[in-house]
Swiss-Prot record:
Family assignment from sequence similarity: Belongs to the bacterial ribosomal protein bL17 family.
GO MF annotation list: structural constituent of ribosome
Gene expressing this chain: rplQ
Keywords per UniProt: Ribonucleoprotein, Ribosomal protein
One Pfam family, short name: Ribosomal_L17
Oligomeric and partner information: Part of the 50S ribosomal subunit. Contacts protein L32.
Keyword ATP-binding: no
Protein name, entry field: Large ribosomal subunit protein bL17
PROSITE patterns documented for this protein: RIBOSOMAL_L17
SUPFAM superfamilies in UniProt: Prokaryotic ribosomal protein L17
HAMAP family: Ribosomal_bL17
GO biological process, one term: translation
Record GO cellular component, one term: cytosolic large ribosomal subunit
Length: 142
């Protein structure tokens, strides 16, 4: 019997689910914290845990598997260099899911998904760099 072996379809086609989870995993690796709905958070956990385990393996085949999953070489480099080193001594349990109330528009339950022992400065790093670059460009123009 296959009782309890299912997964959430989340009202999406298989290809849409696969793309959504790839994008969510990439965002989580980049920012180390994301806010999403609780069912999506519970579904993304095993995907990201397996990616971190691939990063800890560190061989070429694992790197290619990670690239095929999240499709961003820059994030795969972060996964294999930064995150793999951070969790070298931890056997699983790299992700924390915390309930975060309800969304205003449709009252959907929200959750914060973050890496355990995350780098707090990683969240918003790209935005800070973009704002600093714009400020420098304005200063040069003036």
């Amino acid at each position: 019997m296959r009782h309890g072996n299912g997964y959430r379809k989340l009202n999406r086609t298989a290809s849409h689910r696969k793309a959504m989870f790839a994008n969510m995993a990439a965002s989580l690796i980049e920012h180390e914290q994301i806010v999403t709905t609780l069912p999506k958070a519970k579904e993304i956990r095993p995907i990201v845990e397996k990616l971190v385990t691939l990063g800890k393996r560190g061989d070429l085949h694992a790197r290619r598997q990670a690239i095929s999953a999240i499709r961003d070489v820059r994030l795969v480099a972060k996964l294999f260099d930064t995150l793999a080193a951070r969790y070298a001594t931890r056997n699983g349990g790299y992700i924390r899911i915390m309930k975060a109330g309800f969304r205003a528009g449709d009252n959907a339950p929200l959750a914060v998904v973050e890496f355990v022992e995350r780098d707090v400065d990683a969240k918003g790093k790209a935005d800070r760099a973009r704002v600093e670059a714009e400020a420098a460009a304005e200063a040069d123009a003036a």
